[in-house]
Regions:
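Short, well-ordered turn and helix-capping elements at secondary-structure junctions
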Residues: 17, 31, 70-72, 104
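Active-site segment of metal-dependent pyrophosphate-handling enzymes
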Residues: 72, 92-105
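Short, flexible coil/turn micro-motifs enriched in small/turn-prone residues
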Residues: 5, 26, 65-66, 71, ...
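Conserved Nudix-box catalytic region and its N-terminal flanking loop in Nudix hydrolases
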Residues: 47-89
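A broad, low-specificity signal for short, low-complexity segments enriched in glycine/proline
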Residues: 2-8, 14-18, 57, 75-82, ...
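Acidic, metal-coordinating catalytic segment for phosphate/diphosphate chemistry
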Residues: 1-44
């Protein structure tokens, strides 16, 4: 589902460049991006050989919290492909062997 109007306030959406997502629908009234409705996503825990975990602060999402790499799957992508793409987009790292440790629906 692709939004034309904000589901919260009804304002017509504009196209705005948002972080590493590129241009996307954005509610200038609510000050938030509206992602296409797609039910599957990934959350990736990225750790190095010392077991140090990468955390992100994405100000366009929240200025108060850190988060793990995450993102919506694109049509036709596997969870592993999504994890590789999102880690590349958000951390600038290349991962070669992503491992699925669990799923939840």
């Amino acid at each position: 589902m692709r939004f034309t109007y904000c589901p919260d306030c009804g304002t017509k959406l504009i196209q705005k460049e948002v972080g590493d997502e590129g241009f996307m629908p954005y509610c200038d009234n609510c000050k938030k991006p509206l992602f296409d409705m797609f039910s599957s996503c990934i959350i990736a825990l990225v750790a190095n050989e010392k077991q140090e975990v990468a955390l992100l602060r994405q100000n366009y999402i929240s200025t108060d919290y850190y988060n793990l790499v995450s993102g919506y799957m694109k049509p036709g992508e596997t969870a592993e492909e999504t994890a590789v793409r999102e880690v590349g987009e958000e951390l600038g790292l290349t991962i070669n062997e992503p491992k699925i440790t669990g799923t939840y629906w």
